[in-house]
């Protein structure tokens, strides 16, 4: 009986301890949320100079090269949008946490769109543009649009007055990703082909761009087709251009190498079907570029890692195509670029001409302010008007 009583007491103690631990974790999460919210609120209040604001939303990263790129983006926006305050957020909580821990370089604080939008609302901005720094409209863009922005407009946290929400009606807009439409893919192709380093590389051999892409089942807006369209516009200029991705079916590195060898492919993307014929390309030299806003883990590992047998760098070289992902001695340039931001080949947002394309989307979004194309708040939704 004493043994049973002891075991029962031990079980109660264990459950109690677990309950206290769970409560402690909840308290810590709540405390951290409030702490980060106060930090963002203080920044917004201190830096507010206007009643209009642009919040740029990137997925995030933990590399210095990417951090430097984000600074260039923000600086460009501040220079090109006078009268607007500009802030940057990460949509990836994992990137935010890893950046704070200093995963690859010195620790750095970034915050998610929820904290920024809370602070922006509390600062009573009158016009708000949320600009996506994604390349195509996919899973991350959906998260920004249908979670962060929607929750803000619906006053999820209950921190805004009805009067303020009414004032936001038709005064909040979302800037679309780099290749939201087919015409954007054509514009990007023209810009990339004019970049001096790309133009020189494609004149000497293959230029292969590596995008991210949406895996099967996650191509919410049919954005994957933009990679195929971009490639076709590039190849209309020079057949040494190729475009592939990390996650999109039919465009993985094996597929790109088969295209280089020569074949006909029927791309099936959503409701769109495209037959594309690739002539055999006998070039023995290739240059790889990240087709992403920044060069982070995917560019570092999936594209350029010489020690990874499955990286684009390794597989291209194994196919007897002398391939570089950086201009100088590969491994040294790669590591240097990622840790101190020098000695690398740029990703999309590092190119001034490409940043202008994103800013064009922001201007298009601004033009929608005050119109039926802007977002409405629940206080003025059609069924309540």
What are these regions (language model features)?
Residues 1-9:
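Bacterial N-terminal signal peptides that target proteins for export
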Residues 9-17:
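Hydrophobic helical h-region of N-terminal Sec-dependent signal peptides
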Residues 18-22:
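C-terminal motif of bacterial Sec signal peptides marking the signal peptidase cleavage site
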Residues 24-385:
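Active-site-proximal alpha-helix that buttresses catalytic centers in soluble enzyme cores
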């Amino acid at each position: 009986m004493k043994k049973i009583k002891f075991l029962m007491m031990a079980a109660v103690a264990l459950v109690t301890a677990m309950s206290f631990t769970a409560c402690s974790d909840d308290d810590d999460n709540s405390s951290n949320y409030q702490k980060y919210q106060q930090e963002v609120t203080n920044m917004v209040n201190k830096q507010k100079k206007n009643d209009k604001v642009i919040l740029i939303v990137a997925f995030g990263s933990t590399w210095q090269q990417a951090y430097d790129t984000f600074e260039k983006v923000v600086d460009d926006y501040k220079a090109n949008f006078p009268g607007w305050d500009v802030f940057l957020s990460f949509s990836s909580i994992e990137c935010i946490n890893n950046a704070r821990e200093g995963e690859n370089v010195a620790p750095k604080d970034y915050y998610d769109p929820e904290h920024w939008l809370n602070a922006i609302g509390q600062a009573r901005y009158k016009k708000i543009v949320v600009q996506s720094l994604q390349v195509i409209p996919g899973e991350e863009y959906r998260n920004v649009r249908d979670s962060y922005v929607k929750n803000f407009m619906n006053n999820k946290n209950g921190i805004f007055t009805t009067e303020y929400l009414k004032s936001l009606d038709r005064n909040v807009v979302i800037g679309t990703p780099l290749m939201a439409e087919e015409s954007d893919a054509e514009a990007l192709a023209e810009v990339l082909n004019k970049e001096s380093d790309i133009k020189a590389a494609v004149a000497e051999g293959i230029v292969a761009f590596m995008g991210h892409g949406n895996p099967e089942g996650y191509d919410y807006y049919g954005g994957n087709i933009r990679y195929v369209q971009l490639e076709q516009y590039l190849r209309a200029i020079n057949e040494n251009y190729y475009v592939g991705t990390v996650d999109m079916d039919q465009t993985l590195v094996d597929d790109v190498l088969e295209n280089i060898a020569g074949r006909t492919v029927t791309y099936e993307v959503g409701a769109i079907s495209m037959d594309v014929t690739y002539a055999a390309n006998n070039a023995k030299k290739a240059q790889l570029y990240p087709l992403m806003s920044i060069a982070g883990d995917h560019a570092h590992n999936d594209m350029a890692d010489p020690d990874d047998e499955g990286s684009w760098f390794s597989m291209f070289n194994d196919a007897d195509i002398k391939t570089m992902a950086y201009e100088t001695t590969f491994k040294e340039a790669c590591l240097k670029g990622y840790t101190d931001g020098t000695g690398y080949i740029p990703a999309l947002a590092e190119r001034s001409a490409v940043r202008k394309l994103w800013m064009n989307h922001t201007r298009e979004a601004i033009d929608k302010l005050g119109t039926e194309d802007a977002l409405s708040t629940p206080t003025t939704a059609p069924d309540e008007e």
